[in-house]
Design a protein with these regions (language model features):
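Hydrophobic alpha-helical segments of polytopic membrane proteins
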Residues: 110-111, 117, 177-190, 197-257
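Interfacial segments of multi-pass membrane proteins
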Residues: 207-220, 307-333, 391-404
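Alpha-helical transmembrane segments of multi-pass membrane proteins, especially transporters
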Residues: 176, 180, 224, 362-370
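Membrane-helix boundary/helix-loop-helix interface segments in multi-pass membrane proteins
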Residues: 2-48, 52-53, 59-195, 379-392, ...
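Hydrophobic alpha-helical transmembrane segments
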Residues: 85-93, 328-345
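Loop-to-helix entry and N-terminal half of a specific, functionally important transmembrane alpha helix
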Residues: 349-390, 396
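Transmembrane alpha-helix boundary/anchor motif
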Residues: 92, 100, 159, 264, ...
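Hydrophobic, glycine- and aromatic-enriched re-entrant/interface helices and adjoining loop segments
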Residues: 130, 134-136, 225-331, 359
Length: 436
C-alpha cells in the first residue's frame, strides 16, 4: 500500500493521507495539475500543434453542424460538447501513450498485427455497412462503433517499423529482407481495400515510402508498385470505357465490376474525370457546394460562424470540413492549416534524424507520413484535385474512433520524442524506475 501511494505521488503529485490530504486538498489538486504539465514532455511544437488543431476543430465543428442538428432535432451545442469531450479523451490518450516507453510498442506490435487480421475479416462479413462497405464494428459493452482499419493501420506501422529495424543486415535480400516486410503490408491492404480502397491506398503509399527510407531494395519496391497499379489502371480504363459522354452518365457495367463497392469507385472516377464547371447533378452536388464555399471565402473569409455552404454541403463537419474552413477563414486560413501539417511533418522528420534507435525513428516517420498524407488527401478532395475518398482531416474533422486513434498515433510519436529528449539531456531528466 505504501509503495502504491509512493507511485501515485511521484506520477501525479497526489499527496498521501498521512501527509494530510484532507487538510491540503486544494494544494493537492494544484500539485497534481503542475506535475501533469511538468510530466508532459517530448516535442513542445507537436504539443502546440495538437492544441491549435483542436481549437480549430471546436470552432469549425460548432459552425458546421447546424444542418446535422436540425436533421436529428438536436442543438449545435450538443455536438460542440461531444467534440470537446472527444478532444479531452484524445489528449488523455496522447498523455498516457507518450508516457509509455516507445520500446513497449515494439513488443506488442506483432500481437496487435495478428489481432487486427481477424478483426478486419469479421468487419468485412459482419460489420456495420455504409455505402455498401463494411467499415465498423460495434463494441457490445459500451455500444460504440469503431473503424477496424484504424487499428490495423497502427498495428501494421508498428510491426513494419519493427521489421525494418531488425532486418537491416539482410534488407537487400529478397527472401530474408523483402518478403517478411511486404507480406504484412499486402495482407492488411487486401483486407481493407474491399470496404475502404482509399485507406488501403494510403497505407500502401506510406508503407512504400517507409520501405524506401528503410533501404529496402529499390527494384523490389518498384516491382511491387507496378503490380499494385494494375487494378488501379483497370479501374481507370473501365471508368473511361463505360461512360457515355453524350448523355453524361455511366453505362451498364459488366457483372465482374458490379459487385461490392467497385461501382462506387468507378462512379467517383467518372465524376472526377468528366464533370466540368457547369455540370449540375446528384453526383456533382457535393463538390459543387464545396467550390461555392471556397469561392465565397476569398482571401480573408466570411468570418467564424458565417458559413452559408454548411446548410447545403453534405458532411461539412467531416469529409468536407476544409471547404468550411476556406469559406469562413479564407485562403489565408486554409494556408495556415497547410502550414500546420507541414510543420508537424518537419518536426517528425527532425525527430527521425535525431532518434538514435531505428525502431523509434521508423515508427515516428510512418505515423507522421500517414497523418499528413491523409490530411492532404482530404484537402485535395475539398478543392477537387482528387476524387472523393471519404477520409477525414486529422484532429479537425468531427469523429469518433478515428480521432482517438489519431491521438494515440501522436502520443506514440511524442513517446519517441520524449526518449530523444532524455538521450540528449540525461542530467536534466531523471528516469524513474517505476515509470510506466
Amino acid at each position: 500500500m505504501t509503495q502504491q501511494k509512493s507511485i501515485l505521488k511521484k506520477l501525479f503529485g497526489i499527496p498521501s493521507i498521512e501527509e494530510g490530504v484532507f487538510n491540503t486538498s486544494i494544494r493537492g489538486v494544484e500539485g497534481m495539475g503542475g506535475n501533469l504539465v511538468q510530466k508532459t514532455s517530448g516535442d513542445r511544437v507537436i504539443w502546440a500543434i495538437v492544441v491549435i488543431l483542436s481549437l480549430i476543430s471546436l470552432l469549425v465543428v460548432y459552425s458546421s453542424t447546424g444542418s446535422l442538428a436540425y436533421k436529428y432535432s438536436k442543438s449545435t451545442e450538443s455536438y460542440l460538447f461531444k467534440q470537446f469531450a472527444l478532444i479531452i479523451s484524445g489528449v488523455i490518450f496522447i498523455y498516457f501513450a507518450h508516457r509509455v516507453n516507445y520500446t513497449f510498442y515494439s513488443r506488442v506490435a506483432k500481437i496487435l498485427f495478428l489481432i487486427s487480421i481477424p478483426l478486419l475479416i469479421y468487419t468485412y462479413f459482419f460489420g456495420t455497412t455504409l455505402n455498401e462497405g463494411s467499415r465498423w464494428i460495434k463494441l457490445p459493452v459500451i455500444n460504440q462503433t469503431f473503424q477496424t482499419s484504424d487499428l490495423a493501420k497502427l498495428a501494421l506501422f508498428m510491426y513494419l517499423s519493427r521489421q525494418l529495424s531488425r532486418k537491416q543486415m539482410v534488407i537487400k535480400d529478397f527472401k530474408k529482407g523483402f518478403l517478411p516486410i511486404i507480406i504484412p503490408i499486402l495482407v492488411i491492404c487486401v483486407l481493407i481495400a474491399p470496404a475502404n480502397l482509399s485507406t488501403a491506398m494510403l497505407v500502401a503509399g506510406t508503407s512504400f515510402m517507409l520501405m524506401f527510407i528503410g533501404r529496402v531494395n529499390t527494384k523490389h519496391i518498384l516491382l511491387t508498385i507496378s503490380i499494385a497499379l494494375i487494378p488501379i489502371i483497370i479501374l481507370l480504363m473501365v471508368a473511361v470505357k463505360y461512360y457515355d459522354k453524350v448523355e453524361g452518365k455511366s453505362k451498364d457495367l459488366p457483372a465482374i465490376f458490379s459487385s461490392g463497392r467497385v461501382p462506387t469507385w468507378i462512379s467517383r472516377i467518372q465524376t472526377f474525370i468528366y464533370t466540368g464547371k457547369g455540370d449540375v447533378g446528384e453526383k456533382t452536388y457535393q463538390i459543387n457546394q464545396a467550390k461555392i464555399a471556397i469561392a465565397s471565402g476569398g482571401w480573408f473569409g466570411r468570418g467564424p460562424g458565417n458559413s452559408n455552404a454548411r446548410n447545403f454541403l453534405p458532411h461539412s463537419y467531416s469529409d468536407f470540413i476544409f471547404a468550411i474552413i476556406l469559406e469562413e477563414y479564407g485562403l489565408l486560413g486554409g494556408a495556415f492549416i497547410v502550414f500546420i501539417y507541414l510543420l508537424f511533418l518537419y518536426r517528425c522528420i527532425r525527430l527521425y534524424r535525431k532518434c538514435p534507435f531505428a525502431f523509434g525513428a521508423f515508427l515516428a516517420l510512418a505515423l507522421s507520413f500517414t497523418l499528413v498524407i491523409q490530411a492532404f488527401a482530404n484537402m485535395g478532395v475539398n478543392v477537387n484535385v482528387f476524387p472523393n475518398t471519404g477520409v477525414t482531416l486529422p484532429l479537425v474533422s468531427m469523429g469518433g474512433s478515428s480521432f482517438l486513434f489519431t491521438c494515440l498515433s501522436i502520443g506514440i510519436i511524442l513517446s519517441v520524442a520524449r526518449n530523444v529528449e532524455q538521450q540528449e539531456s540525461p542530467a536534466a531528466l531523471v528516469i524513474d524506475k517505476e515509470e510506466i
